[in-house]
């Protein structure tokens, strides 16, 4: 996962020390309070919000764990037993977990640095498709960060849902494609694989055009600047041998990719205006 791992994939949001922990972490942001070069903060990466949360908390090993106690109390308030849990209950509870997380974290960040944006926790996978989770993010984030894989073309329906659910703009904080002409094996990572660097450039343009057309995307981050280093020790299992970078491991630029990126990027605002005009014309 894109996080360090939690027991049963349960974040410690119901622990009585969670607020204190967040406050202590956020105190470090005072040093950045007046920094004009900072846009905002991500508070975490790919946290395990999702439909497995409810049973996860209910089956924590320690019966006195605050998360388990909270989940048992929540289940009792719903008037249901463990055997009566439905997918609707699972998604509702995932929203409760996300609500608690974003409320506490956002308040801590803004207490010590009210001058920069809170960009969320980089939702990925299943969580980004669950209404209650995205709604919770929208209530407390200025912009909702999404790591978006598994789609050649950004889904119009999904992006529309993000806007309706969060009532906030979104930013794509991870996406990429890998090229087979790089000499790397490309066996790890979530991005699609294409044949050449030129095709990586086409894939970039295609994906970003879809984001611009949505009317609610305020930015995108390519993952990542440099290729994976197959000789690196202790690398994350998703970052072992793949052509993800703008540059290779000898710091050479993948020029066809970079040229395609530049061609689109310098026209991004004009393209966004054009898509807006088309949308208004079709209404």
Question: Which residue stretches match the model-derived regions?
Answer:
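Glycoside hydrolase catalytic-domain groove-lining segments
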Residues: 92-107, 111-189, 205-209
């Amino acid at each position: 996962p894109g996080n360090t791992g939690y027991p049963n994939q349960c974040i410690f949001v119901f622990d009585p020390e969670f607020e204190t922990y967040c406050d202590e972490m956020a105190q470090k942001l005072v040093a950045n309070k007046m920094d004009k070069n900072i846009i905002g903060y991500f508070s975490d990466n790919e946290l395990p919000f999702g439909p497995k949360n409810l049973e996860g908390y209910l089956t924590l090993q320690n019966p006195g764990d605050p998360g388990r106690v909270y989940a048992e109390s929540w289940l009792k308030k719903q008037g249901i037993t463990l055997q009566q849990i439905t997918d609707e209950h699972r998604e509702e509870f995932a929203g409760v977990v996300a609500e608690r997380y974003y409320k506490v974290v956002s308040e801590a960040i803004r207490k010590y640095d009210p001058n920069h944006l809170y960009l969320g926790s980089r939702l990925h996978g299943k969580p980004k498709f669950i209404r209650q989770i995205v709604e919770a993010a929208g209530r407390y984030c200025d912009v909702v960060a999404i790591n978006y894989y598994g789609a050649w073309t950004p889904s119009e329906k999904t992006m529309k849902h993000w806007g309706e659910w969060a009532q906030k703009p979104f930013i794509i904080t991870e996406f990429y494609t890998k090229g087979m002409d790089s000499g790397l094996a490309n066996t790890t990572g979530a991005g699609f694989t294409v044949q050449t660097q030129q095709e990586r450039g086409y894939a970039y343009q295609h994906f970003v055009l879809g984001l611009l057309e949505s009317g609610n995307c305020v930015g995108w981050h390519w993952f990542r600047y440099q290729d994976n280093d197959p000789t690196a020790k202790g690398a994350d299992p998703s970052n072992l041998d793949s052509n993800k970078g703008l540059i290779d491991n000898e710091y050479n630029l993948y020029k066809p990719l970079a040229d395609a990126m530049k061609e689109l990027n310098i026209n991004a605002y004009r393209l966004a205006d054009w898509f807006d005009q088309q949308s208004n014309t079709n209404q």
